[in-house]
Design a protein with these regions (language model features):
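Conserved Radical SAM active-site core
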Residues: 95-97, 101-113, 137-193
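Short, flexible loop/turn elements at secondary-structure junctions
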Residues: 48-50, 124-126, 174-176
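Local cysteine-cluster metal-coordination motifs and their immediate loop/turn environment
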Residues: 123-140
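A structural signal for short, well-ordered beta-strand segments and their strand-loop junctions
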Residues: 45, 68-70, 121, 133, ...
Length: 193
């Protein structure tokens, strides 16, 4: 991002900055996103070990214009120090990763379990495409980017294993909004099958 050409150095969307082009004044803020921000998921980070996973391939086909960046581990991007989640959310990147352990977590006692004794949740996604003012996710993660674990088959396999010994009440969309990404992931359909 370059500072506003009026010399103030102010890039605030609400500052009312204006610039002159060929003697005509035009709204600088009108084009700010084209100057400063990429579009959502213009960059997709992919862990090397899941680059050829069928779901990874499927998701990448939905974003043909995205720049693909291979990484070793999602935490190298998602958990970096000094991130600005608010700005990142303006040009949110998608991080495709593999969850390798801890597929299910016991629900916290302060959460609604609806009378179920075996209350668990899982995180097939972390963060959200929305920016709701009331949502706790805004302050939960160090990053404004979204992580999607592509190996949902491992979650379902672990669930089948657990269900052989006990019933479970599982919250499948605890750390994200799965329905918002259903067109990309198909996860809600897979969970309900």
């Amino acid at each position: 991002c370059k500072p506003c050409p009026d010399g103030t150095g102010n890039m605030n969307r609400q500052a009312g900055c204006r610039q002159k082009t060929n003697g005509k004044e035009r709204g600088f803020l009108k084009n700010l996103e084209h100057v400063c921000y990429n579009t959502r998921f213009s960059h997709i980070y992919v862990e090397r070990r899941i680059r050829n996973h069928p779901r990874t391939e499927q998701i990448l086909l939905r974003f043909p214009q995205a720049q693909i960046v291979e990484i070793e581990h999602y935490k190298d991007v998602f958990n970096r120090h000094g991130q600005d989640g608010v700005r990142q959310h303006q040009a949110q990147a998608l991080i495709l990763a593999e969850k390798t352990d801890h597929f299910f977590y016991e629900g916290a006692p302060v959460c609604q379990d609806f009378g179920n004794t075996n209350f668990y949740y899982c995180s097939t996604m972390m963060n959200c495409i929305y920016d709701c003012s009331y949502c706790y996710l805004k302050g939960m993660y160090p990053s404004g980017h979204m992580v999607l674990f592509v190996n949902i088959e491992d979650y379902l396999e672990e669930l089948d294993h657990i269900l052989k010994t006990q019933n479970m009440y599982v919250c499948i969309s605890y750390d994200a909004d799965l329905l918002a990404m259903e067109a990309v992931t198909g996860y809600v359909r897979l969970w309900s099958a």
